[in-house]
Amino acid sequence: MAQVLHVPAPFPGTPGQASPAAFPSKEPDPPYSVETPYGYRLDLDFLKYVDDIEKGHTLRRVAVQRRPRLGSLPRGPGSWWTSTESLCSDASGDSRHSAYSYCGRGFYPQYGALETRIGSNPRVERTLLDARRRLEDQAAAPSSGGLGSLTPSAAGSTSSLAGVGLLPPTPRSSGLSTPVAPSAGHLAHVREQMAGALRKLRQLEEQVKLIPVLQVKLSVLQEEKRQLTVQLKSQKFLGHPSGTRSRSELCLDLPEAPDDPAALETRSVGTWVRERDLGIPDGEAALVAKVAVLETQLKKALQELRAAQTQQVDLQPQAWPPPDTQVRVDTVRVVEGPREVEVAASTAAGALAQRAQSLEPYGTGLKALTTSGGPENTLVFRSHEVVETMCPLPTATTGNVHTAKKISITERSCTGAPRMTEPSSVNPRPAAASVVQPENPVPAAQDTTDKKPTRPAAASQDSQAADGAGRASLATKRKEDPADPEVNQRNLQFVGVNGGYESPSEDSSTAENSEHESTENEGPEPPARVLSPAECPQLRPPGAAVATTSLEGPQLSQESQRVPAPEVASGPDPEEEIRMDLSPDLISACLALEKYLENPNALTERELKVAYTTVLQEWLRLACRSDAHPELVRRHLVTFRAMSARLLDYVVNIADSNGNTALHYSVSHANFPVVRQLLDSGVCHVDKLNRAGYSPIMLTALATLKTQDDIETILQLFRLGNVNAKASQAGQTALMLAVSHGRVDVVRALLACEADVNIQDEDGSTALMCACEHGHKEITGLLLAVPSCDISLTDRDGSTALMVALDAGQSEIASMLYSRMNIKCSFAPMSDYESPASSSAEE
């Protein structure tokens, strides 16, 4: 076989120079070679081919140089292939499976020069001539199945000729493998297929080149779309289109509404719904009812004012007494009317100030208590009242107003049979009326007695309602439980009367302000002092009650004489200006809690939560503020006791989320009058700890004692509780806390209540060590004055009180402790063997 020779000479029309130096001089390749389209060289020399087969170097891939495109290759006479421009192009993908490309000498322009330079080879020339002749003969002879009948040569061209099968096998004896040329029709068909494939490949290459451009255009269009979307949204929010439009903006032609649009027809689709169906409370009706009640009360007050003015005009000026006399107006009135429902309270339990007190001046909200009891029979009672009213002096210069108290003695019959009493049967006496001293000296005053006849029951009830709702500010009512229904009952009632008008629906603060303003408008003098519950006269036993009214006058006279005159004539009492008005929500919540305390299954969880929250908020707002009024707290306590003893215990000891009760807050605010009222209730838990672990007794260390009453109050608190109780955090006692804060008065009170001075906290410290550490010399002296004080106790660090004082630099306290130690050592008791008697006996 001939050896394949690679010719590096460029094709015509391509840059570069062909040089013989491309062929090595030491190992020159044979001049005869055939190159395949993919750069493989086939050696035609048989011997060389056999040698390569043995060595395994039959096919070698060489670097393919770039050749010109189609049409650039010359068609020389030495080329038997008529379409060399298509078969020899390395850009064709279909030419990889084609047959051999036999290029003659005219294909390479320098082939002749190489042949002449290297030298002629007769063997190669004969092979070429033989191959040319065979090709011409085969082209002249018709061939029908050239492609199918040809088989590839087994001599080394299997890889390049297997797919085509152009060359028949050559006899091995000849030493040459000469391929047989295909037919012209087949070559033309192959050439057309390759040309079409090349065109298709070229189109695909052009389309591939357009892909980046199209991607760029697509990204540009997407960006424009995003900008247009943002611009469109901004125009929708602004409500008007922009004046300028960019070149790439999308123009949308939207139909515009006509200038004169047709009138749109509208209709209402609302539905009328009653508020009570929606669950909304009828506030308007409640306000209307409230206004009606206020108007009625105002009319009654105006009528009374007109009546008083008429009486003043009827009085003659010459009938007045001298200016030095006191003004006293006595009125005896017999009233008959239906019995009102009252809250019964026993006088056998509780302290003196807590027994059976009237709830009339506490507001109209207490009428809701009637719902908890059963139906009662309508009873008719008659009341004999001794009333002192206010009469302005008809002087030309000033008009002074005198405030008096109303003392009513009511005699009721439980049988329901009404009894009428004539006005003449009542013996009015001057001693039966309470004496009221004027607050300021009055220039001219006279004593008059006004006797009012018996009025109808309805009129008397209206008058009493006006008195109770408009002018009643404080009442103390004592009621005895009847042993027999036939036994008459007597109630003694003290009512402070003010001339002003108040609304029963107002709260305590509003009522207080309006009462004060009305008092100022009527006269320059403040109201008289109302007797406290302790100053009220004691009731007689029920067995000593007298059915007739003739003896009531002396009895009242004796009891009124027990009241000291200076107290009656003292200045204005702030208790008169306090008005308690229970809200309906608080009353309903208290009743609900009372039911729950009696029966835990009586309320649902939601109802219990609502009632508990309402009572907690109202009670904390009333009693836990720093400016809480003790009288208002006392009245609420009386109201709660009248409802139920369990309710009183529950409300007084109710705690907030931090575990603080009203007693905790009152002690912390140093509001000791409220503390006194809470302690007087008899149900206050004084040792209850909050979440921080402190009891009200421990919190007294933070309070400041201002008066002697405050000291007495904390003494009462200490006696009711455990003064040696420890806090849950550090184990400190009330004495340790008071010593640490330097409260000398509290320390004295605790020592007076026998507080233990030797109790140690979790660190082993005592109250004496706390005093030495903080440098409280006076408190140290108080602690050392206690005989049971042990100065030798040590803490966890092994330090005594003397060592603590020395470490803190308290030299004076250290000297006091040292002196106490020396005194103890000198007065220490001797043992038997050290006593003088034993020593003398031994001698």
Curated annotation (Swiss-Prot):
Expression (tissue specificity): Widely expressed with highest levels in liver and skeletal muscle.
Modifications after synthesis and translation: Phosphorylated by casein kinase II upon estrogen stimulation. Phosphorylation induces the release by KANK2 of NCOA1 and its translocation to the nucleus where NCOA1 can activate gene transcription.
Gene3D superfamilies (UniProt xref): Ankyrin repeat-containing domain
PROSITE patterns on file: ANK_REP_REGION, ANK_REPEAT
UniProt cross-references to InterPro entries, sorted A to Z: Ankyrin_rpt (IPR002110), Ankyrin_rpt-contain_sf (IPR036770), KANK1-4 (IPR047184), KN_motif (IPR021939)
Region (Interaction with NCOA1): 661-827
Compositionally biased tracts (Low complexity): 457-470
Residue segments, region Disordered: 1-31, 161-182, 410-577
Ranges of biased composition (kind: Polar residues): 547-561
Positions of region (Interaction with AIFM1): 1-72
Keyword annotations from UniProtKB, A to Z: ANK repeat, Apoptosis, Coiled coil, Cytoplasm, Methylation, Mitochondrion, Phosphoprotein, Repeat, Transcription, Transcription regulation
Residues carrying Phosphothreonine: 170, 331
Localization annotation: Cytoplasm; Mitochondrion
Protein name: KN motif and ankyrin repeat domain-containing protein 2
Annotated organism of origin: Mus musculus
